Amino acid sequence: MKIGIIGAMEEEVTLLRDKIDNRQTITLGGCEIYTGQLNGTEVALLKSGIGKVAAALGATLLLEHCKPDVIINTGSAGGLASTLKVGDIVVSDEARYHDADVTAFGYEYGQLPGCPAGFKADDKLIAAAESCIRELNLNAVRGLIVSGDAFINGSVGLAKIRHNFPDAVAVEMEATAIAHVCHNFNVPFVVVRAISDVADQQSHLSFDEFLAVAAKQSTLMVETLVQKLAHG
């Protein structure tokens, strides 16, 4: 099995990258892909860049060039669920765009023409992630993750997301674009991210302060999940 892992930022991939043995670096389309073995398992780790276009471009290049069997999207996210705090884990059961609006033509809010309203994560990957969470004794929430090209840092943006997606547990800027590409390529995916901030008026301060905490937690989760997927 070859496992594809995608993170947007240097801070979100550096801990994993440093653990890859026999590492080789591929630079394509402004993205960097690091291939090798993570605890004996073949992996391809992508640093995509921030935002939906960068994530979609990177995911496509990763899938075409490295042919992974599954995709794990890792990194940080803003918490929406009331039980979440910095360092907690969110696992996707579905991903949707929070900034797409073609409702004038009868589509659901967040749905693009020719696409499902939401992109469902793979049940087996979800189950494996939740098993890792239990083993590591982490606080976690599974649910809807929403994505858009905006850092949510104020009451107006937060209220809009809560109104349109009352069940959303986290918000970030890449996951749904990655899920969209995986859907088109028929490759299973799951989003496993750690909370770096709570999406409110102080979220930019929290993000800067706690990104390292989120990166450490998400790296622990992904490393454990890769082991479980490879060896059961």
From Swiss-Prot:
Instruction: Tell me what this protein is called.
Output: 5'-methylthioadenosine/S-adenosylhomocysteine nucleosidase
Subunit structure of this entry?
A: Homodimer.
**Any GO CC annotation of this UniProt entry:** cytosol
Q: In which pathway does it act?
A: Amino-acid biosynthesis; L-methionine biosynthesis via salvage pathway; S-methyl-5-thio-alpha-D-ribose 1-phosphate from S-methyl-5'-thioadenosine (hydrolase route): step 1/2
What's the superkingdom here? Bacteria
Binding residues for substrate:
G78, I152, M173, E174
Report the family membership: Belongs to the PNP/UDP phosphorylase family. MtnN subfamily.
Q: Which reaction does it catalyse?
A: S-adenosyl-L-homocysteine + H2O = S-(5-deoxy-D-ribos-5-yl)-L-homocysteine + adenine; S-methyl-5'-thioadenosine + H2O = 5-(methylsulfanyl)-D-ribose + adenine; 5'-deoxyadenosine + H2O = 5-deoxy-D-ribose + adenine
Instruction: State what this protein does.
Output: Catalyzes the irreversible cleavage of the glycosidic bond in both 5'-methylthioadenosine (MTA) and S-adenosylhomocysteine (SAH/AdoHcy) to adenine and the corresponding thioribose, 5'-methylthioribose and S-ribosylhomocysteine, respectively. Also cleaves 5'-deoxyadenosine, a toxic by-product of radical S-adenosylmethionine (SAM) enzymes, into 5-deoxyribose and adenine. Thus, is required for in vivo function of the radical SAM enzymes biotin synthase and lipoic acid synthase, that are inhibited by 5'-deoxyadenosine accumulation.
List the keywords (alphabetical): Amino-acid biosynthesis, Hydrolase, Methionine biosynthesis
Give yes or no: UniProt keyword Hydrolase.
yes
Q: Which CDD domains match?
A: MTAN
Q: What is its EC number?
A: 3.2.2.9
Where is the catalytic site? E12 (proton acceptor), D197 (proton donor)
The record's SUPFAM superfamilies line, in alphabetical order, gives: Purine and uridine phosphorylases
